[in-house]
Regions:
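Alpha-helical recognition/docking segments in bacterial nutrient-uptake
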Residues: 1-32, 36, 97-101
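Hinge/beta->alpha junction and helix N-cap segments in small-molecule ligand-binding domains
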Residues: 18-29, 45-92, 107-115, 137-140, ...
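Short polybasic/polar patches that bind polyanions
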Residues: 35, 65, 122-124
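Phosphate/oxyanion-binding loops and surfaces in catalytic or ligand/nucleic-acid-binding neighborhoods
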Residues: 37, 51, 63, 67, ...
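Short acidic/polar active-site loop segments enriched in Thr and Asp
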Residues: 39-41, 104
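Short acidic capping loops at alpha-helix termini that bridge into adjacent secondary structure
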Residues: 41, 71-75, 127-133
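Flexible loop/turn connectors
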Residues: 93-198
Length: 199
């Protein structure tokens, strides 16, 4: 009978309360924006295969399907979390380029991966966003530390955390609380992406 409150996870069970961001919809919108801006080969870079990670990956696939584009598994790359650093991401992308993988955008599941993509662009002389568009996820302070500043998906983490506390207190006080609360993300546009092209 101990209540459980999950952060950004979903689990249907009595006395379990879930507060999460709609990661699938958010990543679908981010991929859509890149495709609508003229990007043809978007590299999706991620490091986690947890519930949130699976929803993000599904969103990418949904966007490609909506644009009648096939899913190229070579462009869906899981980054080794054991080597998780900005410079390691840069080196990984440089290696992919040396192997012949072509991409004109990087959509990352976390801002730190996107910053690594920005470092890659700087290292190989690709101009952002003219030659490479980059989008991160979480809208962290890292977004303001790049040049140009990083476009990122704001997954409303502060609001989610507030709602978790409200839910937990409500449950402990005996009030009826919603079993599932889903927040809608927002894409914060900055200088690392181009505007949508006219159709």
């Amino acid at each position: 009978n101990v209540p459980v409150v999950l952060l950004n996870g979903s689990f249907q069970c009595p006395n379990v309360f879930c507060v999460l961001c709609d990661d699938e919809r958010a990543m679908k919108e981010a991929m859509n924006q890149l495709l609508d801006s003229g990007c043809k080969r978007v590299l999706y870079l991620y490091h986690s295969s947890n519930n949130s990670g699976q929803r993000k990956l599904a969103g990418c696939r949904d966007a490609l399907a909506a644009h009648n584009l096939p899913v190229d598994e070579m462009l869906m790359r899981r980054f080794d979390a054991d080597k998780f650093s900005i410079h390691a991401v840069r080196d990984c992308l440089m290696e992919l380029e040396r192997e012949g993988l072509q991409f004109d955008a990087v959509l990352a599941s976390e801002d730190v991966l996107a910053v690594g993509a920005m470092k890659y662009a700087q290292a190989v002389g690709r101009r952002v966003p003219e030659n490479l568009s980059v989008v991160g996820y979480n809208n962290s302070n890292l977004c303001l530390c790049t040049e140009p500043e990083l476009t990122s998906v704001d997954n409303r983490l502060p609001a989610i955390c507030e709602r978790i506390v409200e839910t937990m207190l409500g449950v402990l006080e005996g009030r009826e609380m919603p079993e599932k609360t889903v927040f809608t993300a927002e894409i914060i546009q900055r200088g690392s992406t181009r505007a949508a092209q006219d159709k």
